């Protein structure tokens, strides 16, 4: 379902992360976009790909594309959410760099600190050669229900922020 300001459907959680990556891929000139599956049911593919990408391309940082929850501090329509922490804590120097670039971009964003939840970043952080990573996602209401809802402006901000960061990191 679509209204003037929102898109609402089931299973938008993972789909929005993929949609974001595909939109960024349309204009990306230099970077890697990597899709993995099975992470919520055992994992392992992220760490395999991480070793290959780091060895071949010397990449050691990642942006994790997904959604986050609309909460008291993360507002619907307030811009893409940059997570300073979920079940893991990304390296402060990398978080600070991303926030600095986000401010320079003039793209609407909001900061969040999650008390729970997580992402595939665990595989990146716990690896033999850890990467810098940060989770950035559009705030979603009614997560994991048939009525997941995201503000269109937050989706646009998410796509724009990823494109900007991929160019400037």
Question: What spans do the regions from the language model cover?
Answer:
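Acidic/histidine-rich catalytic neighborhood of metal-dependent amide-processing enzymes
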Residues: 1-10, 15-85, 117, 121
């Amino acid at each position: 379902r679509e209204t003037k300001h929102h898109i609402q459907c089931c299973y938008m959680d993972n789909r929005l992360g993929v949609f974001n990556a595909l939109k960024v891929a349309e204009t990306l000139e230099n970077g890697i976009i990597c899709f993995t599956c099975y992470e919520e049911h055992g994992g392992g593919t992220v760490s395999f790909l991480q070793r290959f990408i780091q060895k071949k391309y010397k990449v050691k940082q990642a942006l994790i594309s997904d959604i986050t929850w609309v909460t008291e501090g993360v507002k619907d329509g307030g811009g893409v959410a940059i997570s300073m922490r979920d079940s893991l804590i990304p390296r402060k120097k990398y978080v600070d760099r991303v926030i600095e670039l986000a401010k320079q971009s003039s793209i609407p964003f909001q900061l969040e600190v999650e008390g729970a939840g997580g992402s595939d970043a665990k595989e990146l952080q716990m690896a033999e050669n850890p990467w810098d990573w940060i989770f950035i996602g559009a705030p979603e209401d009614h997560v994991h229900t048939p009525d997941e809802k995201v503000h269109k402006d937050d989706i646009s901000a998410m796509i724009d922020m990823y494109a900007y960061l991929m160019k400037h990191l």
